[in-house]
């Protein structure tokens, strides 16, 4: 445990470019080098883990920090910045105490006794707008709602009392055809339970369907893919330590290099017992680009590496083995008419070493052409664009001292062709120690940024984010009970 509540760990996760920021700010008219296209009108939201106090344990995982949301509001060639902490129950308790009270990642046995039984949500993994509120998401908790304009925390969000389980994935998908939020929660009947609940939330903000099933073994069920008729779940062996393991000081998750992986295909609006499981040899995936169907075949595009990609969750009792970190965008194809439980094929789609995949969100669940990835080799200073029709990948790289973050696609208009728009991507300038925002023509990133937005502060590296056009960047309309007015 830390010796002082004012001492930050002397580790790579809390020093240099990763040092805490903790700045809640409003900065209008950020400096821009280049020209921001006038058509860009909306907000780029992102969220990072930014501890407000030094952690109780210096060697904890890096993402066990308070959610800090940043909004970049684009309008008329100008950009304004707003950053706010998500005011979770946990955040407010620690702010009142003036120190960290919660212990290791997902380990309640390491908490200060004063917070026993309190919600441990950090709301720090992803943000997106649905039903007129900005949802801050983390997979071990319900969402937290924020006002899309002010970033004021509105409170815990259970979809008007209809959330079917205690958790909600950070990687919910928005169906571009129906407007439904497609989500799930794992460990849905308690920590380390194999139970998963999939659910659909209508644009009116209520769960309209839910189905329960069990995964083959407990694992971190981090992401999913959707098609018009199916939801697809990868299960890879980032397995749980169990309660006794947590009490002994193990991390919540650890890698198992021997177990098979599984891919579950469940009919949307179906029953849990209709899920079909396919298996493949041991390998790793975390984040999903897209999924789509071709007759009775389902294609699932995800970033795959031969071994564990999470250095903070090594095999229990062993140091992290980096030998399997060559991660590439890969297509897994399964045939629902086949009696075979294996994958029909696995196809590497690019040789670019990349993760944090994003496509044009209007094409979620559909056949698609364009995808973008964060370079995941060396200093992680590159952006890749994959053209699946032409089978080519173009790359742009920042200086080696400037690590980049997850890309996000901005469509030129809601009815523009796929890929017609821009990519926005943040980076940390290792020379100035300030954050910058780069804007690229989406299908010509190799030419470099059209514009670079210069921040007067350094923000913590963010995990995920989303774009919302101006029509959705509106104040939340709530009644006295905090319920969204439809």
Model-derived segments and spans:
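Beta-propeller domains
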Residues: 1-486
């Amino acid at each position: 445990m830390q010796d002082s509540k004012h001492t930050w760990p002397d580790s790579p996760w809390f020093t240099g470019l990763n040092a805490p920021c903790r700045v809640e700010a409003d900065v209008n008219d950020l400096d821009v080098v280049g020209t921001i296209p006038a058509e860009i009108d909306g907000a780029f939201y992102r969220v990072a883990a930014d501890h407000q106090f030094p952690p109780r344990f210096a060697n904890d995982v890096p993402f066990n920090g308070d959610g800090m949301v940043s909004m970049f509001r684009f309008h008329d060639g100008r950009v304004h910045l707003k950053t706010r902490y998500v005011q979770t129950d946990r955040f407010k308790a620690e702010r009142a105490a003036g120190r960290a009270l919660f212990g290791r990642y997902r380990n309640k046995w390491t908490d200060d006794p004063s917070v026993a039984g309190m919600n441990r949500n950090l709301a720090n993994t992803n943000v997106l707008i649905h039903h007129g509120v900005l949802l801050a998401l983390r997979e071990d908790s319900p969402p937290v709602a924020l006002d899309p304009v002010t970033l004021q925390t509105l409170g815990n969000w259970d979809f008007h009392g209809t959330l079917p389980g205690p958790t909600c994935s950070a990687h919910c998908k928005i169906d571009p055809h129906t407007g439904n939020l497609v989500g799930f929660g794992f460990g849905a009947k308690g920590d380390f339970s194999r139970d998963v609940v999939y659910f659909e939330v209508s644009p009116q903000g209520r769960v309209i369907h839910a189905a329960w099933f069990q995964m083959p073994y407990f694992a971190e069920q981090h992401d999913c893919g959707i098609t018009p008729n199916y939801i697809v779940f990868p299960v890879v062996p980032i397995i749980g330590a169990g309660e006794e393991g947590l009490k002994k000081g193990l991390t919540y998750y650890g890698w198992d290099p021997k177990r098979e992986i599984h891919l579950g295909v469940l009919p949307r609006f179906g029953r849990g017992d209709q899920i079909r499981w396919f298996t493949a040899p041991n390998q790793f995936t975390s984040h999903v680009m897209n999924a789509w169907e071709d007759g009775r075949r389902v294609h699932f595009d995800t970033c795959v590496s031969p071994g564990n990609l999470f250095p903070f969750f090594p095999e229990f009792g062993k140091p992290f083995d980096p030998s399997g970190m060559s991660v590439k965008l890969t297509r897994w194809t399964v045939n629902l008419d086949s009696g075979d439980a294996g994958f029909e094929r696995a196809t590497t789609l690019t040789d670019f070493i990349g993760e944090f995949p994003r496509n044009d969100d209007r094409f979620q669940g559909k056949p698609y052409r364009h995808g973008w990835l964060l370079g995941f080799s060396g200093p992680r200073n590159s952006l890749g664009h994959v053209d699946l029709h032409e089978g080519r990948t173009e790359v742009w790289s920042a200086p080696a001292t400037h690590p980049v973050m997850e890309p996000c696609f901005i469509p030129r208009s809601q009815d523009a062709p796929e890929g017609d728009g821009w990519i926005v991507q943040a980076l940390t300038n290792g020379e100035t120690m300030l954050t910058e925002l780069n804007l690229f023509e989406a299908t010509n990133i190799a030419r470099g940024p059209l514009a670079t937005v210069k921040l007067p502060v350094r923000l913590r590296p963010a995990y995920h984010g989303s774009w919302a056009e101006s029509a959705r960047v509106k104040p939340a309309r709530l009644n006295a009970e905090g319920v969204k007015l439809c």
